[in-house]
Amino acid sequence: FLKDHFTVKLEPMAKTSRRSHAKFLKMRSLFAGKIAGAPGQDAEAYALAKKHGVQVVFGETRVLMQQATLGLIASGTATLEAALIGLPHIICYRTSALTYLLAKRLARVSYIGLPNILIGKMGIQERIQKDCHEDQLAKDLNTLHDGQSYTKKGWEQKRMSDELKSILGTQKASKSVAASILENL
């Protein structure tokens, strides 16, 4: 089950990474065909990424984010880490229909990305379920970078880093994140 769930999440990102690489040859990291391997996932789970010519790198997530121009990131703490680094990205999340329906009924939050939850608005585009596909993700990336430089929206995401650091800096980060999530439940 977990391997199938993981593959469902990975497929649109792998396809978009390969497709965007052809358009943005000068970009680094994701557009150099790399994906940060998630801790706890074995290399076999990334067979789909390799099939699409995407290199999987383990233990270097922060380095990849720091070197990247743009990112496609599955929802979770990695989205907050990317936002704090100042990496413009799209939050991607796809799971089984049953899991999605259960989560939607149980968790009543306006956003799934930690940066969006913390700032209380859609600062980073979230693509969930049927909206998380290659064509849409490629369009979203184009709203952040035009192939030569960041767009207005891309620069806005880069500046979100300061706002998030301000929010998290007033308390211990984990308490601040937990309080913000509880407020939004």
Each language-model region and where it sits:
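Nucleotide-activated sugar donor-binding and catalytic core shared by glycosyltransferases
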Residues: 1-185
